[in-house]
Design a protein with these regions (language model features):
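Ligand-binding grooves and catalytic loops that recognize ribose/phosphate and carbohydrate rings
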Residues: 63
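Active-site loop segments of alpha/beta catalytic cores
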Residues: 1-56, 66-68, 72-88, 100, ...
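A contiguous, low-structure linker/loop signature
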Residues: 85-122
Length: 280
């Protein structure tokens, strides 16, 4: 790959990350370091902020999202293994949006409205025409065009498993479902995993770089994903093992590289289970 305008030595950084992911020694820890530039590396006109704009995740103004993407990396130096990248991200649980939830913009974030009222009537389908999915694809196309020779594309924050089901069902309702309809929960998790990879594969085919590498929080020389279960802080190790571990076993086996977002001290009881996953 020719040098990126925003990271001329990106090939050296990717070589180090390849060594790091494969257990090699790069002489130090991997470092994702950015530092502000005194002047932007290039001048890109700024569109005026739309009225009522509250979050960079918003889908209320496509052109403004494109402009934010174009300007996202121009004010930074990228050092260590950090790489300039943008994502067609709509919030921390894009999969829930693709599967039927609605997003409500908040101050610096987006909230997801539950969409499963009657569990037995749930339809788990891939909807090519879903508004949020189409917004993601349109934004990714523009980011790819703008980023050519300048920056990489990262995956949006898809999320999976119990966190996605909680966003769609409502957290308190799902906690009750674990006790009252565990078979429905298990079936739903299987369907969510299958649909996750419909979206993941479509995104990877679009955003992978010429090495086949992909980016989420860091770069990896293949199919990378971040997994998580913030919901796990509210359940016992036995429930985590019964409901979430099968999800994580399958998902970590279906990507080349994975990382886990471990959310706070409430999730510590699941330490041994997570360490038992050979692919994580």
């Amino acid at each position: 790959m020719t040098a990126l305008l925003y990271r001329p030595d990106i090939d050296a950084a990717r070589d180090r990350m390849t060594t790091w992911w494969n257990g090699g020694d790069i002489g130090r820890p991997g470092l994702l370091v950015t530092a502000p530039r005194q002047e932007p590396i290039e001048e890109i006109p700024i569109l005026p902020e739309p009225p009522g704009w509250t979050t960079h995740y918003s889908v209320s103004d496509f052109d403004y999202r494109v402009n934010l993407s174009a300007r996202a990396c121009i004010h930074n130096h990228y050092l260590g293994e950090a790489m300039p990248q943008v994502a067609p991200d709509l919030g921390p649980n894009c999969l829930a949006l693709y599967l039927g939830s609605k997003g409500v913009d908040g101050d610096g974030t987006v909230w997801f409205l539950p969409c499963i009222d009657d569990p037995e009537a749930t339809q788990w389908t891939f909807d090519e025409d879903n508004f949020y999915w189409q917004f993601t694809l349109r934004l990714a196309r523009e980011q790819l065009r703008l980023g050519r020779g300048k920056f990489l594309l990262s995956f949006p924050d898809l999320i999976e498993g119990l966190d996605t089901l909680a966003a769609m069902r409502d957290t308190q309702r799902l906690l009750i479902d674990l006790l009252e309809r565990p078979e429905w929960v298990q079936t739903s998790l299987q369907r969510i995993t299958a649909l996750y990879f419909r979206y993941y594969d479509a995104l990877y085919d679009r955003i992978a770089d010429e090495r086949g590498g992909s980016y989420y929080w860091a770069w990896a020389p293949g199919r990378l994903s971040k997994f998580q279960c913030d919901f796990s802080a509210m359940i016992s190790p036995a429930m985590f093992d019964a409901f979430m571990m099968p999800v994580l076993r399958e998902m970590t086996a279906r990507v080349d590289y994975s990382i886990y977002h471990w959310d706070g001290p409430g999730a510590i009881p699941h330490h041994d289970s997570l360490l038992s996953l050979p692919e994580l």
